[in-house]
Amino acid sequence: MMRYEDVSQLSLMNLTYEEQRLENIRKNEDLLRSLGLGAPSEATTLATPSNLKTAGNQRRYNDTLVGKSNTGRNRSDSPRKRPTKDREDLNLVPQSAIKRRQSVRLGGKEKPNYTREQVTFNSDRDTPNTPSRQIKSTHSHPGSEEEDIRQVKTRTLGVRVHNPKTFGHIPGIGVGKWWATRMEASADAVHAPTVAGISGNAHEGAWSVALSGGYPDDIDLGYAFTYTGCGGRDLKGTKQNPKNLRTAPQTSHQSFDNPLNAALKRSAETRNPVRVIRGFKLQSKYAPPTGYRYDGLYIVEKAWMAKGLTNGLMVCRYAFKRMDDQGPLPQKDLDHDDDNKA
């Protein structure tokens, strides 16, 4: 005679994708409730800024979150204007008579070619204050040009002041700090990887995670959320995107043997705080309208294996809870967003 558990498992195997997704969401919600997570504090509602990529609007957005700048002084929205010189007399002087300032030390030397040389740093190095110099050879191989472009786009950030491989807040970076790109968040040492969602190792645990995109059966309550691990994808990618491993379908079980999954599992054991940033691609009302935002420190309350949405393959799951006394999380004005899309 078939047991009730067997009938239940059989019915789950016959679920459609959407039914399985809703079932997984229900289980995630039940698990968060079982951890005793209370109701979140009242959230701050923010309208969608029109353009956050300018320095002035970025300051206004950050000041909306924390009230004042990190230095405690109110910042002026208008940029400081430099005094302009009267150029009327300069027009009377012929251009040939105007000489540019020239270094005595460089005088007589060959003019440097800055297009051949680029100072970069590796986001995963143990010594964040030591830059590595990448020299682009004039006799580079055909396949190296794409790598050079990728390095310029993702790693020419300057030298970090702080080490991202530390637990807790980064000095000088307050909760609510906003960046236009993940590269800027990496430069500030809040979340070092510019692509990967988990930063850490199996021995110490995770230092930070990024919520951006995510899995469709994860839930985000702001003060708590579930997070799905990485791995299990076909390394060849898809037919349309053969090198895009992020969009490749899952073809095998995830495992805690994966170093990044093991890092979050270790964090559940040590209960060391994990920095969390949310990105605009996250399907959540707690996601920023654009860019990426630092939402403070969370504790990994639980790590477990669960059935995913692809052919019953298993995934690594984690439950996060936000630490107290970090202020309310901002919340998107969904009505305002809908009006803009109309």
From Swiss-Prot:
Assigned keywords, A-Z: Nucleus
Top-level taxonomic group: Eukaryota
Binding site for DNA: 218
Subcellular location: Nucleus
A single GO BP: negative regulation of gene expression via chromosomal CpG island methylation
PROSITE patterns: YDG
Chain segments annotated as transmembrane: none
Record-annotated YDG domain positions: 168-322
Biased composition (Basic and acidic residues): 74-90
Pfam family, one: SAD_SRA
A GO-annotated cellular component: nucleus
Positions with biased composition (Polar residues): 42-59, 115-141, 238-257
Family annotation (InterPro entries): PUA-like_sf, SRA-YDG_sf, SRA_YDG, UHRF1/2-like
One example GO MF annotation: hemi-methylated DNA-binding
Disruption phenotype: Mildly decreases methylation of the fifth carbon of cytosine (5mC) in DNA; simultaneous disruption of CLR4 exacerbates the effect.
Alphabetized PANTHER family for the sequence: E3 UBIQUITIN-PROTEIN LIGASE UHRF-RELATED (PTHR14140), OS04G0289800 PROTEIN (PTHR14140:SF27)
UniProt function note: Involved in the maintenance of DNA methylation. Binds hemimethylated DNA.
Protein name, UniProt field: UHRF1-like protein
Origin species: Cryptococcus neoformans var. grubii serotype A (strain H99 / ATCC 208821 / CBS 10515 / FGSC 9487) (Filobasidiella neoformans var. grubii)
Gene name of the record: UHF1
